[in-house]
Amino acid sequence: MLKKKNRITSSVAFKEIFAKGNVKESECFRIIFKKNNLDYPRYGIVVKAQNSKSAVQRNALKRRIRNILRDSLPVFSKGFDIVITTKKDSINMDFSELKESLNELLLKLL
């Protein structure tokens, strides 16, 4: 689990990032990011019901993404608000492929 300070929780913050953020994409992720005035990054994860009808699969994917983010958190000392949305292909990928794809995309932000 990410620390509370590293999570985006309010719908207002999500809407602002979606409206004013920049976008980077890969085959299985879409990252929308916006600079914040904090000394640490904040993350939000969105897995649409269109990707999988099963809530169990969607929540498992969110847990995997949080685990990857927890490992890469020390790399991002800059202040960014980052929303990670998944694409349909990401549901069936194994952990190592997810980690490689997400880390590759996050490194583009540096």
Could you describe each region identified by the protein language model?
Residues 1-110:
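Positively charged, solvent-exposed patches that mediate nucleic-acid binding
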